Amino acid sequence: MELKNDTQISKFILLGISEDPLWQPFLFGLFLFMYLVTLLGNLLIIIATITDSHLHTPMYFFLSNLSFADICFTSASIPKMLVNIQTKNKVITYEGCISQVFFFILFGVLDNFLLAVMAYDRYVAICHPLHYMVIMNCRLCGFLVLGSWVTTALNSLLQSSMALRLSFCTDLKIPHFVCELNQLVLLACNDTFPNDMVMYFAAILLGGGPLAGILYSYSKIVSSIRAISSSQGKYKAFSTCASHLSVVSLFYSTLLGVYLSSSFTQNSHSTARASVMYSVVTPMLNPFIYSLRNKDLMGALRRLLRRKS
């Protein structure tokens, strides 16, 4: 007897990172702490770049957009997770699940695009320093950010709309702390080939494209740095992109970790645990990576905190 597809489902169950009740208080405290640190760190960067005239440059304009995207990325999943743990109710409505799919894809891919834009900014700064302000003018900066938003929004709208065509049977349990599109596709009873193809091509175009741009930019940056004769000049040139390179390495290494964990393990919660690295830990660490060795940003933050006090 075949299972009948239930297209009128009203809810899913998010199993989270662990179903062990003994772990729930620890997980609540840990993720609440990481979420608050993420909000505070990224908000400080946004406020500092807006209020301090020394930071009104293309690099910090892109950084403030990345900080905003990171806040939204974590806010798409962590608040609901905290509510579920606190209330001991793992249910999420169908509408809420589709909304999570939309925003999780939107801000996750937007991070990817903004990192590529920032790599291009560093390429122009190091390889064409005399023409930097001419090339990276306000119009181009606005176009790059707006283009990133529009492209990722259209992709997210397409993929979440495709999720609406999925039909589900009896198992509505998602072994994750967020409604991830891939998990919904795995639960679906009907033909998922169109969804698989859209996800596949989106991963190649919107994931591989920005990564290729980052790699190309840094290949040119490395060539330019090697051509500098003095060691002090090489160090100064490299230091301008060290923070961005660290963030890029962290972001893509954690994404690779998620892919490998989902491919080589049978643990249903392993993907969720690995996803914490790129969806929670990376947005939390980004403000520290960008500010610790950045004298301009640290100075702006000190001036901001002095004004507040």
Curated annotation (Swiss-Prot):
Residues that carry a glycan: 5
SUPFAM superfamilies: Family A G protein-coupled receptor-like
GO molecular function, one term: olfactory receptor activity
Membrane topology (UniProt): Multi-pass membrane protein
UniProt entry keywords in alphabetical sequence: Cell membrane, Disulfide bond, G-protein coupled receptor, Glycoprotein, Membrane, Olfaction, Receptor, Sensory transduction, Transducer, Transmembrane, Transmembrane helix
Record-level GO cellular component terms: endoplasmic reticulum membrane; membrane; plasma membrane
Paired cysteines (S-S): 97-179
One GO term (biological process): sensory perception of smell
Compartments in which it is found: Cell membrane
Extracellular side: 1-26, 79-97, 161-196, 266-269
Cited InterPro entries: GPCR_Rhodpsn, GPCR_Rhodpsn_7TM, Olfact_rcpt
Residue ranges of the TM segments: 27-47, 58-78, 98-118, 140-160, 197-217, 245-265, 270-292
Keyword Transmembrane included in the entry's annotation: yes
Cytoplasmic-side segments: 48-57, 119-139, 218-244, 293-309
Pfam families on file: 7tm_4 (PF13853)
Similarity comment: Belongs to the G-protein coupled receptor 1 family.
Main function: Odorant receptor.
Protein name from the UniProt record: Olfactory receptor 7A40
Source organism of this protein record: Mus musculus
